[in-house]
Regions:
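A domain-level signal for the structural core that forms small-molecule/cofactor-binding pockets
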Residues: 2-64
Length: 64
């Protein structure tokens, strides 16, 4: 069934990853999809490999 791919900055805590996975699973379950059928894959990328509007996130969000 559904495979949800989530991209985040590197360094997200395991606790927050669990919250993301549970939240996504819960929403799909509300749509009638069995929990067992939901797959969530979290991809981590360093801010130096991520850009928006031509600006690297390592510069744009240097303080985060």
């Amino acid at each position: 069934m559904p495979v949800v791919q989530v991209s985040v900055w590197a360094g997200m805590s395991e606790e927050n990853k669990k919250k993301v996975v549970e939240g996504i699973t819960r929403v799909l379950e509300e749509l009638g999809i069995p929990r067992e059928a939901v797959t969530v894959i979290i991809y981590e990328a360093p801010k130096t490999n991520w850009a928006t509007g031509g600006q690297l996130h390592s510069e744009k969000y240097a303080n985060r």
